[in-house]
């Protein structure tokens, strides 16, 4: 299959790197021809002379453009093949209005971890997408991480939980590292300690059968240091703050 990418930002580039492990041919079209050629050379893929030329040559078109650019970029383009969009807030219905509602349309929501081929990606599709095409789309998303079938009505929630949450996790890691610095551990070493601990904690959760609550109980000895810290986190409203940030993220996604 020949896959064309309109828009080649960081996320599209990460996905292309994942696809380079597959047998698919890749063609790209960016904001300008010189830019497209520059990126194509780095990624070892083909550059199209224009968006329409890319469309005419592709079996599947991936839209890697920002949501606010959809109307401008898609105006005047004529599609004849399945389209896959990764834009936050752009529904399948809106995508159909901007392209062709009779085409097979697929929507995905990857996250930044696609850069290391470990994205957590949501996928949904309209009723024009065959089982075979959906399987191909999942093969694409699996090439740069793991894929979850998510109803489109839950995409904004998924965006918050998987798309935006890495930033919140990085903020938490940064805060823990700063606490280490406060008590005398150099920043680089403190950050390494915290990052390794977060990574191992996530792996422990994935590989075992215990819930987060179970693991918290195992770490929290009666009258110990961990329970003292946990109670202080709740005193300052950690859970409420996290849920509130998810609320804000979902509301922003709906407004796009």
Identify the residue ranges that each predicted region occupies.
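Aromatic-residue-lined binding/catalytic grooves and analogous aromatic/hydrophobic interfacial grooves
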Residues: 165
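Extreme N-terminal starter segment of soluble prokaryotic enzymes
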Residues: 1-4
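Catalytic nucleophile loop
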Residues: 12
């Amino acid at each position: 299959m020949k896959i064309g990418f309109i828009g080649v930002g960081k996320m599209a580039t990460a996905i292309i790197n994942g696809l380079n492990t597959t047998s698919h041919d890749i063609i790209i079209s960016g904001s300008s021809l010189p830019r497209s050629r520059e990126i194509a050379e780095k990624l070892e893929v083909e550059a199209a002379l224009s968006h329409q030329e890319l469309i005419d040559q592709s079996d599947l078109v991936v839209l890697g453009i920002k949501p606010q650019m959809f109307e401008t970029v898609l105006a005047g383009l004529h599609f004849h093949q399945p389209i896959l969009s990764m834009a936050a807030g752009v529904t399948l219905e809106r995508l159909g209005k901007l392209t062709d509602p009779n085409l097979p349309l697929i929507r995905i929501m990857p996250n930044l971890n696609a850069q290391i081929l470990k994205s957590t990606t949501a996928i949904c599709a309209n009723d024009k997408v065959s089982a075979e095409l959906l399987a191909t789309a999942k093969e694409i998303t699996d090439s740069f991480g793991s894929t979850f079938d998510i109803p489109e009505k839950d995409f904004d929630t998924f965006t918050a939980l998987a798309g935006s949450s890495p930033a919140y996790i990085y903020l938490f890691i940064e805060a823990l590292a700063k606490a280490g610095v406060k008590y005398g551990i150099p920043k680089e070493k403190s950050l390494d300690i915290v990052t390794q601990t977060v990574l191992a904690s996530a792996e422990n959760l994935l590989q075992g059968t215990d819930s987060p609550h179970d693991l918290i109980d195992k770490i929290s000895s009666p009258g110990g240091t961990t329970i003292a810290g946990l109670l202080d986190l709740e005193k300052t409203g950690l859970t409420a703050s996290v849920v509130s940030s998810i609320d804000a993220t979902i509301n922003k996604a709906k407004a796009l």
